[in-house]
């Protein structure tokens, strides 16, 4: 397991960057060995790929990390995420983290079995410590830190403590510092650093540097960490016993530390976010890796980076992380402090990337990983880092192209898998990560431009290509030649400097050898595993994650510098990322090179046609000497010729749309797109015209070779693609694809022919057709589809191929990615990045990917429609249940907001922080901790598709790129039933071993910018993310888990609705129709909230970043609510909210409604309802007020919330939920190209800071009140958990629910929505109250959007009045959502909604029915009640009254009929039996519908009984009162059983219907001359009529006895009495029967008419309230959350940190976390 210690900024001042570590965890315990733990301290960064990770035996008295790598090796990370979620619920990150470990332990994934308990204990301790800290208000910060240290002598505990502290905001900073220290194994130092960092960044940096450089060395306290009150924390050296054995955890190896950091972030919502987003990042970024746990860890690293970014560590953290990575904390800190500037930020980013690279060093797919980049360092640091680079298997960091002139390597563990292609480039992702094996040789190695000296440099840049160092005679690569060169090159910097460093530096021979050896080891490992394609993440995913990480770093840097968005852009475009071990590949196998006809000549001319200046060359410093070596591309390394004579790629230039070198004529690839269309090759001049799609995209002219003929030409004799060779799979059918999730595996020939350079895989038209059929839907729209889904299918398809073809495909994809990289780099202009630029690049990249599958790339490319992917919920038993596609609509827009919050904390950093927040949020979302929830609730294994949208921080192009990535993010879950291996291949972890996790499917694909778990790039338009739809539903950072985050372009059902659904602004509040408890709403709205929950984590991070804000928050959170606050923060209750800490602030005073003891609401919960402090929440359900708040102006309100500090046009940028038959679909609105200028941001920040200072005193006062209330409530519980309400003496009443077990080692904040139910303690889970158990078992809708309210509370506390107002409105929306979520019963459904019954299988096997509402979602009204809603209520009440009146009338009519029958001269035979068991079969339920229910049987009936049954079903009888008047003369008269005298015999009462049926049966029996009914017939009749066999038998006996006097052959009228004989009586009775039937028919018609009228009325009402009552496709209440509220929460946090805009973002983060928690409960 590798850990990257990422510094998280606890910066108390924006100007003062502080170090905090948000550790990104690559739980790659597979690669840890006990030897690694025992490595000397001077070699903490030296990694060896190991199969197992064994921690040294540590003294339990001195808590230390006990790791058993074996556990982690499996799905430990996923389980880890799950655990994180639980822990988040129990306690923030720590609890989640511990839970993650705990789950892992239960799953056997977790290396920390001892620590899992310890970790849980630690988490509990952390929680307790946090609680103590909170209670102590950071007095016990030292204690908590000590506890954390003690716990974390597993760095994790420290992290959790840090997170708790982060939650405290004061503690956040301190704790984050501690976490960082723990990560560095210098907890004290980190504390000092954080405290100092907040105060003195340089000192912190130094400490961090020391820690980073001497992670293992600095276990001892170099400086005493100070509490928030600057009280030195006294640590017992024994308590903080971090031995060299722990060194692996520290430094790059500190995977656990990173995780802890992430946990901290998540704990403070960041860690959960991180863990969630990490999980998702790993899933999204390294889906396959997650399966391997390597990817998961890589994802963690990315997430961790994001977490750091999110933690407002984003700025400082990025710096710190970078510092840790670079071991140049001082410089980084200085850069951060000074730079929140582009250079320092870029450096930090590079460093940050480096830290990822180092973490990846232990990954099994280290070749796919990037090594840390060295910056200018002291010789000892350089030597240490160099040693690490040499030892680590990773060789590929990707450097981001920062406009600041500094390059930041954005390679995340996932991103290294990307081959120097733009993060959005799908092909590069496919080339590197799509397939599990590394190419022994790459067709081309894109020259990654190294950063200038002092900048981070990619490890691959260090490694040279096969050629010798001589660069003479070689033409320097041009600007457009490689994305990496552009990304690494500061476009603003002079071209002279660019030309001066255009050559790539060659790494030392030892490094090359080591890399080659590592590659061989990797390959060997893969071979041993029996798979050539290990489940690595898709490059796109990994890139997105990497980009997100980079973005986080960039965002952090941008936050620091504002980074000109160049960092962000560079990160998403991290074209500098080279193909993993490209040098190794180039040199690894000559035989393979020969196969592919790929060579590495000394000095080939590259891109000789490129007019742009060459990229900067990478230079590495070793031993004080600088060796420069340019990348050499072999002249033999050419794209396959068109005629097929030469080629190493399945792609022809035409197919790929690339302008490849002329057939064997030499020369490298030409730029993919040339604005001027000039090329040096004559062949290119005659290339066909670009495709119409490219023309429409204004992408420029493609230089294509005329290779159309070659594509259709037959295969050469040497071709390995003959139809009979078995290499191609049989044409799959839709059934196979749907059922197996992939194409059937073809039979592999026993001896496949060797792959030759003549092969052109696409020359086989059959194969091309198959690719088209599987990968090219007919109706594709780039803005409405996620590319990753095609990539996933493509991966599945390729995996069915034989190895030669697989390698061929990989080679071709690599070529495509390299060319695409050049294209990206060619048109890059950091100064003029348009919003459409990145979007077009993404589209171009995808189109190129598809063009390779076309016979004629110039032909019109049909836009494929997204193939429906049915989202599935996988229960704990592994069964796949079709879940409501609820969570899918969650978009990572809020994540962007989270990043914004972090950025705000650091500096003005509004944009940068936003990016960071996005990363953090993404991370939170990624964690599917819901699966680990130990409650009885089922955890929906929802795929989280987080889409990070960096709004302000990102340039418009970056925002668009994020949106594109989000759109491309995988939306659905796996289709059909897949095997475990297949799920793992998809990056889906089925944590069936965990008690609760129905499915630990973490599938979020982070957008490249959003970073960490899908990033929040989706809604980049709004800084606040308020308009953005939180992409992460997955249990918000702390609680979230297992949430679906759906790409906005996809409907919840996974199918795209062709109709443009009516747009709905997620940010706008949605008014939900009243829902009964049984109804489960779609998670779509809630998903936004989940994103907001992620933002909550960011808020915690924000607290850490901005000490001032944190202090304010701490004052609010820590002093009064400290313990609760931590829990609250974990629950996504806003830490930042002043005195609202952990409490839910309602936008307005509300009349609370209480919940009855059964947990059902006595009153409806409406949109806009707020949860008052006095609400009865003992059942775990949030009460809501009866009052409906009239909606304010939705657009205006949202815009106010979003625009508080967002300079984005929210109305334009709002993500719209569209109505579709399949469910809600989310579409992105246009993104504004404008970003606020730095001056505007500074002004806003100044204004916000002033406002914050004014609010601080109020917050303190509120905290005191809350603190008293908390002690009162917390002291009230003994042993068991209790819910307590916290009343805030504030304009807004907020109710906090704390699930406290004072005797447990950890206090668990129980999300009122039941986000986390298990309470971990040393002794084990604490008992839960009956109300809690009820909520756990019954509340599928447990996900209440109280989080949004929390966000609102935070907003009010932190944000300006305007923002607060907006936030309040948003909160109301959240409340509505919460109400909707809470309601377990199904309310009357709108007429236009078609309810579909689905079932959710809980972890205990109970099937819970859930309704899916399918209808249109219209723009929800704002919070305030509207006359329409009031009218709707009144109308509904009137309808109910009318129904009651109708029922009464029906009863009266029935009574009248009975009286008429009684008055008739002829009475029916008084032998009708009526038993107490009699149940009216067709009796209508008096309350609800007027439809009658019939009980049918499937038993075959005899001819005798079939008539009666036919009459029963064909004839609808009006409902009859169960008890008609007893009259010996009535139709339902009493029948004597004949056993007793008339006076004493018991009377059985039959209904008229029963009597009539039995008489009919008796008459039919007589007609058929049957002597008696058989026992079977009697049983059938009794079953039909709801009677017992005895009753029916006695009835017939009595009937037979009375009918004996009449001739046997003469049928007796069943209704005639034995005393009344004669035709007259029979005729009279028949007449009465006819009248009765007529009356019944009339009544039925009346009922139908009434029903129709009611339906019409409902439709009218629904139309009237169409704007106010959105109808969610799926009723999973968890998912229903509103991003608006979350945005508001983020705003509050940002206000605490910087400006209101940032606060809004922070608030959004808080909401996301809560949503995640909610999702976790539901799941």
UniProtKB/Swiss-Prot annotation:
Q: Which InterPro entries match?
A: EF_hand_dom (IPR002048), HD (IPR001356), Homeodomain-like_sf (IPR009057)
> Compositional bias (Gly residues) at which positions?
660-669
Taxonomy, superkingdom: Eukaryota
Where along the sequence lies the DNA-binding region?
A: 1543-1607
Region named Disordered: 36-425, 440-522, 543-756, 878-978, 1080-1214, 1226-1264, 1345-1399, 1456-1498, 1513-1547, 1598-1625, 1661-1723
Q: What is this protein called?
A: Homeobox protein 5
Pfam families (UniProt xref): Homeodomain
Tell whether Transport is among the UniProt keywords: no
Hey, what's the signal peptide range on this chain?
none
Return the Pro residues bias intervals. 746-755
Quote one Gene Ontology molecular function term: calcium ion binding
Q: What does the entry give for GO biological process?
A: box C/D snoRNP assembly; regulation of gene expression; regulation of macropinocytosis
């Amino acid at each position: 397991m590798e850990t990257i210690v990422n510094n998280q900024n606890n910066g108390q001042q924006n100007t003062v960057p502080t170090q905090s570590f948000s550790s990104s965890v690559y739980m790659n315990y597979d690669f840890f060995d006990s030897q690694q733990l025992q490595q000397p301290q001077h070699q903490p960064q030296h990694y060896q790929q190991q199969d197992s990770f064994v921690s040294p035996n540590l003294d339990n008295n001195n808590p230390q990390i006990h790791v058993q790598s074996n556990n982690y090796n499996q799905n430990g990370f996923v389980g880890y995420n799950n655990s994180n979620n639980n822990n988040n619920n129990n306690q923030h990150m720590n609890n989640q983290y511990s839970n993650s470990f705990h789950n892992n332990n239960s799953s056997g994934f977790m290396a920390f079995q001892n620590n899992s308990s310890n970790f849980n204990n630690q988490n509990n301790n952390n929680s307790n410590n946090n609680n103590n800290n909170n209670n102590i208000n950071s007095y016990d910060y030292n204690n908590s830190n000590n506890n954390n240290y003690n716990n974390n002598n597993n760095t994790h505990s420290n992290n959790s403590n840090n997170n708790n502290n982060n939650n405290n905001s004061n503690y956040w900073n301190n704790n984050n510092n501690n976490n960082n220290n723990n990560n560095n194994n210098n907890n004290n130092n980190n504390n000092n650093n954080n405290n100092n960092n907040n105060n003195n960044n340089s000192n912190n940096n130094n400490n961090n540097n020391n820690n980073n450089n001497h992670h293992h060395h600095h276990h001892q306290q170099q400086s005493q960490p100070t509490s928030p009150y600057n009280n030195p924390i006294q640590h017992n050296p024994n308590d903080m016993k971090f031995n060299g054995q722990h060194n692996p955890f520290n430094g790059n190896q500190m995977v656990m530390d990173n995780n802890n950091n992430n946990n901290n972030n998540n704990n403070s919502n960041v860690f959960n976010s991180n863990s969630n987003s990490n999980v998702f990042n790993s899933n999204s970024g390294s889906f396959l890796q997650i399966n391997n746990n390597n990817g998961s860890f890589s994802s963690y690293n990315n997430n961790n980076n994001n977490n750091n970014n999110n933690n407002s560590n984003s700025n400082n953290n990025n710096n710190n992380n970078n510092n840790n990575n670079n071991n140049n904390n001082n410089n980084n800190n200085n850069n951060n402090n000074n730079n929140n500037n582009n250079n320092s930020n870029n450096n930090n980013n590079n460093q940050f990337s480096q830290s990822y690279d180092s973490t990846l060093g232990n990954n099994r797919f280290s070749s796919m990983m990037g090594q840390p980049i060295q910056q200018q360092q002291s010789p000892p640091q350089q030597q240490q880092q160099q040693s690490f680079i040499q030892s680590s298997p990773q060789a590929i960091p990707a450097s981001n192209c920062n406009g600041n002139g500094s390059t930041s390597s954005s390679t995340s563990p996932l991103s290294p898998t990307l081959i120097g292609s733009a993060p959005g480039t799908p092909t590069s992702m496919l080339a590197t990560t799509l397939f599990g094996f590394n190419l022994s040789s790459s067709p081309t190695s894109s020259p990654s431009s190294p950063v200038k000296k002092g900048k981070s440099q990619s490890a691959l840049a260090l490694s040279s290509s096969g050629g010798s160092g001589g660069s003479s005679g070689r033409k320097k690569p041009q600007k457009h030649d490689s994305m990496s060169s552009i990304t690494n090159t500061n476009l603003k910097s002079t071209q002279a400097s660019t030309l001066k460093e255009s050559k790539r530096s060659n790494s030392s021979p030892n490094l090359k050898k080591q890399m080659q050896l590592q590659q061989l080891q990797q390959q060997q490992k893969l071979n041993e595993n029996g798979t050539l394609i290990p489940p690595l993440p898709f490059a796109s995913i990994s890139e997105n994650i990497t980009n997100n990480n980079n973005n986080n770093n960039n965002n952090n840097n941008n936050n620091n510098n504002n980074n000109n968005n160049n960092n962000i852009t560079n990160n998403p475009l991290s074209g500098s990322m080279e193909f993993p071990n490209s040098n190794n590949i180039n040199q690894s196998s000559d035989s393979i090179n020969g196969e592919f006809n790929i060579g590495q000549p000394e000095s080939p001319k590259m891109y000789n046609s490129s007019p742009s200046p060459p990229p900067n060359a990478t230079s590495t410093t070793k031993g004080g000497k600088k060796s420069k070596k340019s990348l050499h591309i072999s002249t033999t390394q050419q794209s396959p010729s068109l005629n097929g004579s030469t080629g190493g790629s399945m792609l022809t230039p035409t197919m790929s749309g690339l302008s490849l070198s002329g057939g064997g004529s030499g020369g490298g690839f030409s730029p993919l797109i040339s604005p001027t269309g000039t090329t040096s090759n004559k062949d290119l001049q005659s290339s066909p015209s670009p495709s119409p799609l490219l023309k429409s995209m204004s992408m420029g002219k493609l230089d294509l070779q005329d290779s159309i003929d070659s594509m259709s030409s037959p295969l050469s004799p040497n071709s390995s693609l003959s139809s009979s060779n078995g290499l191609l799979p049989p044409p799959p059918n839709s059934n196979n694809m749907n059922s197996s999730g992939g194409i059937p595996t073809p039979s592999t020939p026993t001896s496949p022919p060797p792959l030759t350079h003549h092969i052109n895989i696409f020359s086989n038209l059959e194969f091309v057709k198959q690719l088209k059929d599987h990968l090219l839907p007919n109706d594709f729209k780039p803005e409405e589809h996620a590319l990753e889904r095609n990539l996933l299918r493509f991966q599945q398809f390729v995996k069915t191929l034989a190895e030669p073809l697989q390698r061929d495909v990989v080679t071709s994809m690599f070529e495509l990615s390299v060319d695409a990289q050049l294209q990206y780099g060619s048109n890059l202009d950091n100064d003029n990045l348009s919003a459409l630029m990145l979007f077009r690049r993404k589209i171009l990249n995808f189109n190129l990917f598809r063009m390779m599958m076309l016979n004629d790339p110039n032909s019109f490319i049909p836009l494929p429609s997204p193939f429906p992917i049915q989202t599935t919920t996988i229960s704990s038993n592994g069964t796949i249940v079709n879940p409501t596609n609820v969570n899918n609509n969650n978009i990572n827009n809020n994540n962007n907001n989270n990043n914004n919050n972090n950025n705000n904390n650091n500096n003005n950093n509004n944009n940068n922080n936003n990016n960071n927040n996005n990363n953090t949020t993404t991370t939170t979302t990624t964690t599917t901790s819901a699966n680990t929830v130990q409650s009885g609730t089922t955890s929906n294994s929802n795929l989280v598709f987080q889409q990070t949208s960096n709004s302000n921080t990102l340039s418009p192009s970056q925002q668009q790129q994020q949106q594109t990535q989000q759109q491309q993010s995988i939306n659905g879950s796996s289709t059909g039933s897949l095997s475990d291996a297949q799920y793992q291949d998809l990056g889906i972890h089925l944590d069936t071993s965990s008690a609760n996790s129905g499915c630990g499917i973490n599938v979020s694909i982070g957008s490249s910018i959003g970073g960490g778990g899908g990033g929040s790039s989706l809604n980049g338009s709004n800084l606040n993310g308020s308009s953005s739809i939180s992409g992460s539903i997955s249990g918000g950072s702390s609680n979230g888990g297992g949430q679906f985050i759906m790409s906005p372009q996809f409907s919840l059902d996974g199918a795209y609705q062709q109709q443009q659904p009516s747009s709905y602004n997620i940010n706008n509040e949605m008014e939900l129709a009243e829902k009964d408890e049984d109804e489960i709403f779609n998670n779509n709205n809630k998903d936004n909230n989940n994103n907001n929950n992620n933002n909550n984590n960011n808020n915690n991070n924000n607290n850490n970043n901005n000490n001032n804000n944190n202090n304010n928050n701490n004052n609010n959170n820590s002093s009064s609510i400290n313990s609760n606050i931590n829990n609250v923060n974990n629950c996504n209750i806003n830490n930042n909210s002043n005195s609202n800490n952990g409490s839910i602030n309602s936008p307005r005073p509300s009349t609370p409604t209480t919940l009855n003891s059964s947990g059902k609401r006595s009153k409806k919960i409406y949109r806009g309802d707020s949860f008052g402090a006095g609400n009865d929440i003992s059942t775990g359900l949030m009460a809501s007020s009866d009052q409906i708040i009239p909606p304010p102006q939705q657009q205006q309100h949202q815009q106010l919330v979003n625009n508080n500090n967002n300079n984005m046009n929210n109305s334009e940028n709002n993500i719209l939920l569209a109505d579709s038959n399949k469910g809600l679909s989310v579409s992105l609105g246009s993104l504004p190209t404008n970003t606020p200028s730095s001056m505007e941001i500074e002004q806003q920040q100044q204004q916000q800071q002033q406002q914050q200072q004014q609010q601080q005193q109020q917050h303190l006062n509120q905290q005191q009140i809350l603190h008293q209330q908390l002690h009162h409530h917390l002291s009230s519980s003994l042993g068991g958990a209790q819910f307590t309400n916290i009343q805030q003496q504030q304009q807004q009443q907020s109710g906090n629910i704390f699930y406290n077990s004072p005797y447990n080692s950890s206090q668990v904040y129980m999300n009122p929505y039941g986000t986390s139910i298990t309470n971990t303690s040393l002794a084990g889970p604490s008992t839960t109250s009956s109300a809690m158990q009820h909520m756990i078992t019954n509340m599928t809708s447990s996900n209440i959007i109280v989080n949004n309210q929390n966000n609102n509370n935070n907003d009010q506390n932190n944000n300006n009045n305007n923002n607060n107002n907006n936030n309040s409105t948003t909160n109301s929306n959240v409340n509505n959502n919460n109400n909707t979520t809470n309601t377990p019963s199904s309310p009357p459904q709108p007429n236009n909604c078609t309810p579909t019954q689905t079932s959710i299988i809980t972890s205990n096997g109970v099937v819970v029915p859930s309704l899916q509402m399918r209808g249109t979602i219209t723009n929800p009204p704002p919070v305030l009640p509207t006359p329409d809603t009031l009218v709707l209520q009144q109308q509904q009440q009137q309808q109910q009254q009318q129904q009651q009146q109708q029922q009464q009338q029906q009863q009266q009519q029935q009574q009248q009929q009975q009286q008429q029958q009684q008055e008739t001269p002829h009475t029916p035979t008084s032998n009708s039996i009526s038993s107490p068991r009699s149940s009216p079969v067709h009796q209508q339920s008096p309350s609800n519908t007027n439809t009658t229910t019939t009980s049918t049987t499937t038993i075959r009936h005899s001819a005798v009984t079939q008539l009666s049954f036919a009459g029963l079903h064909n004839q609808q009888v009006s409902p009859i009162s169960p008890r008609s008047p007893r009259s010996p003369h009535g139709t339902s008269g009493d029948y004597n059983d004949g056993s007793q005298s008339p006076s004493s015999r018991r009377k059985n009462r039959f209904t008229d219907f029963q009597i009539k049926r039995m008489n009919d049966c008796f008459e039919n029996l007589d007609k058929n001359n049957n002597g008696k009914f058989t026992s079977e017939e009697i049983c059938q009749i009794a079953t039909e009529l709801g009677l017992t066999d005895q009753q029916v038998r006695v009835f017939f006996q009595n009937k037979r006895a009375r009918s004996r006097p009449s001739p046997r052959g003469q049928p007796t009228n069943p209704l005639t009495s034995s005393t009344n004989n004669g035709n007259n009586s029979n005729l009279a009775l028949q007449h009465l029967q006819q009248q009765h039937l007529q009356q019944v028919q009339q009544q039925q018609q009346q009922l139908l008419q009434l029903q129709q009228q009611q339906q019409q009325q409902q439709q009218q009402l629904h139309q009237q309230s169409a704007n106010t009552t959105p109808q969610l496709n799926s009723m999973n209440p968890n998912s229903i959350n509103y991003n608006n509220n979350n945005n508001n929460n983020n705003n509050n946090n940002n206000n605490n940190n910087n400006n209101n805009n940032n606060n809004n973002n922070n608030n959004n983060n808080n909401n996301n976390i809560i949503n995640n928690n909610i999702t976790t409960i539901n799941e």
